[in-house]
Amino acid sequence: MGLRIGELCGLTWADIDIENRVLYVHRTVQRICTCNSDGKKTKIIISVPKSDTSFREIAIPEFLAEYFMAFKGDDNYYVLSGSEKIVEPRAYQYRYKRVLSESNSGDHTYHGLRHTFATNCIQNGFDVKTLSMILGHKTVNITLNRYVHPDYVHERKLMNKLAMLF
């Protein structure tokens, strides 16, 4: 669904309205530096999303609503942990990398999934404005210039469509 890792970590079951198939993004989890006299330290905070457009409602596809229904926990539980305990972004990134390594799937970041999601959405007919809203971007330019990556196979299909015109 193209969520940022901090948004995913901050997601509680109360943020998922299964009946109306809507996911609400209104918090993020992040690790911040608390540099003090003891040295460089960090702490986990729960805060508001990155920008005003990051507060959003995302329609949930039916197959995902069914999945959520099967695993739904208490409203105050975090989706990733299944409890009131947060899974912090760095820990989730480490888990993701470990799964990729164990499955010989290469070395990718969680954020790369956001790019893949955006590219797949465009290749499957999403309009850029809707995708930009789903991703929580301020402008469609951010979506197009940073998140949507050309694909040779998709380009070939489009070029072959031109042949039908002649």
Question: Which residues does each PLM region occupy?
Answer:
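Short, basic (Lys/Arg/His-rich) helix/loop patches that form interaction surfaces
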Residues: 1, 58, 73-86, 93-137, ...
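A short, basic/aromatic helix-end/turn motif that makes direct DNA contacts
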Residues: 10-16, 132-138, 146-148
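Extended hydrophobic-aromatic, low-complexity segments
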Residues: 9, 25, 33-37, 69, ...
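Conserved tyrosine-mediated DNA breakage-rejoining catalytic core shared by Y-recombinases
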Residues: 10-70
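Short pre-functional
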Residues: 1-9, 22-23, 119-120
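Generic alpha-helical secondary structure signal
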Residues: 63, 67, 91-98
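DNA/chromatin major-groove-contacting recognition/catalytic segments
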Residues: 35-39, 145, 149-166
